[in-house]
Amino acid sequence: VPVLLSSLLFAAANAAAQAPVDCPTLPASSGLQWQQQVQSDFLICRASTADGREVLSLMLSQRDPNIPLSRSLREEKGSFGGESMYWYKPDLGGQQPPGYAERRISVVKLDKGRYAQIALYPGSTQEMGSLQQLAQGMSLNPTAVADGR
């Protein structure tokens, strides 16, 4: 029994040392909820409205997602995680599905070996502005892209 108990304590201490990484806090006034998916080398956070519509996705990774962002699709200037960036219309190979005009994507290099990929799926121009403001104000936990995440 003591061996089992010490094994359980070791496992609990190990789990506490590798506490799960969380998505940035969303303001209560946003009415959004995160759905979080943790993988070995990245974290995906999907923000949805009360009716389940996904309006923002955020991927934090140690690897550059290597998404080509064409200057011709560049739109608004913004910031994320303290870094200046631009929002782009996504390159959908010439397709323009409903709501395309308001969709935005960006990749931000936060520091050495830390990247954020942000995508917005607003239902209107007004919602797009609100989501850009929300993204700009997000506070990233410095361990959000810790080693091994």
Regions found by a protein language model. Give the residues of each.
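A mature extracytoplasmic/lumenal domain signature
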Residues: 38, 62, 89-92, 120-124
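Short, conserved charged micro-motifs
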Residues: 66-70, 128-129
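N-terminal signal peptide c-region/cleavage motif recognized by signal peptidases
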Residues: 11-14
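Bacterial N-terminal signal peptides that target proteins for export
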Residues: 1-8
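Surface-exposed amphipathic alpha-helical segments
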Residues: 26-33, 116-149
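Secretory pathway targeting signatures of secreted, lumenal, and periplasmic proteins
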Residues: 18-68, 97-98
